[in-house]
Amino acid sequence: MLYRDEGIVLRTYKLGEADRIIVFVTRGRGKVRAVAKGVRKTKSKFGSRLEPMSHVALQLFEGRGELDIVTQAESIDHFRVIRDDLDRIARASSMLEAVDQMAQEGEVSPRLFQMLLGGLRALADHNGPLVVPAFFWKLLALEGYRPILDACAECGSEGPLVAFDLDAGGLLCADDRRGTAVSPEVVDLLRRILGGQLGAALNEPASSATTDVEHLATRAMEHHLERRLKSVTLLDRA
């Protein structure tokens, strides 16, 4: 059966001498793995449209096993601005990897697709220090892990909140402090990201507070996934 959908390429890997398996997150079917036949040939009909990060309109044939077959792919956005910047490529790769690890085949999640699309667009528009950390926090919140930020996660005290602990699930007061010490600026940025002021947070210039938020976001994502994010190492080197 043929079907149409809209997807973003998360990753690809070789199959045989000329084909590739393409892993998409799609708007209508969630995570999909499909074979692109002949895509590695010089004169492939797909050209470069099925590279990681590509936003494409797809026609696929639904396979009987685990793999569908890509029959058509038309580019919607190739995110050229990101591809021309090594730092942006590294940041985008960490977003793709997080979604790839988070998404499950057969689980339809239009919000996950839209969140990744929005994250890539934000990264293309401006490469601020909080684009990827904000994406991680929003993705974790979508999956049900939303840190407690308005009061101590242990005793409920409203403050001052001076630490963040992953096992506690959020911020902690001075009496219950453990985990990572956080400044008032970090607390403010976390609240902005998850409290409806994302635009303002994304415009923040680089500072020690944005670096701390980035480290916390990476640790929280890896804690949730129970694995290291390989692309974060690349990001550290970019």
Regions found by a protein language model. Give the residues of each.
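Non-catalytic alpha-helical scaffolds and adjoining flexible linkers that form interface surfaces
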Residues: M1-A238
